Design a protein with these regions (language model features):
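N-terminus-centered regions that define maturation/targeting leaders and the start
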Residues: 1-148
Length: 148
């Protein structure tokens, strides 16, 4: 699998437009892909368990691009696609917000799944989604961006 972003480059500083307040995917889907899950996770958050910034589930297998603003609530989601609860306590994308003076990694990951949907609702945590993804993942690809 391969993840491509017009906004992010693996290992680079996270662009300011992604700081608290799009990326695209293209190609090499594994055989049997029936849906995708996209996440943004900060493993460096001072919580002992990281911080989920974005979780979107049940993207159709023919999804190739998520337009910029897809997680903002301003872009319509296809039927059946859900954004689940982040560690900010709500759905949708919330950008980088590391403590002052710290540099954090923001890992954007797309997971190809062998099921058309995972059975979670909008209140599901990133950990719960990750648990469900674990049992249905065919492949995943990530881009890691930095911000301080």
């Amino acid at each position: 699998m391969k993840l491509i972003s017009n906004d992010l480059r693996d290992g680079d500083k996270l662009p300011h437009r992604h700081v608290f307040n799009g990326m695209g995917y293209d190609g090499d889907n594994p055989a049997g892909t029936k849906s995708f899950v996209v996440t943004c996770y900060d493993p460096d958050a001072p919580t002992g368990s990281g911080w989920w910034h974005w979780v979107v589930v049940n993207l159709p297998a023919d999804t190739r691009v998520l337009p910029q603003g897809f997680g903002s609530g301003l872009v319509a989601m296809p039927d059946g696609v859900l954004q689940t609860r982040t560690d900010f306590g709500k759905t949708g994308y919330d950008g980088a917000a590391p403590p002052k003076g710290e540099t954090h990694r923001y890992i954007f990951t797309v997971h190809a799944l062998d099921v058309e949907r995972i059975d979670v609702d909008e209140g599901a945590s990133g950990a719960m989604v990750g648990f469900n993804v674990h049992f249905h993942s065919l492949a995943s690809a990530s881009i890691t961006a930095m911000f301080s």
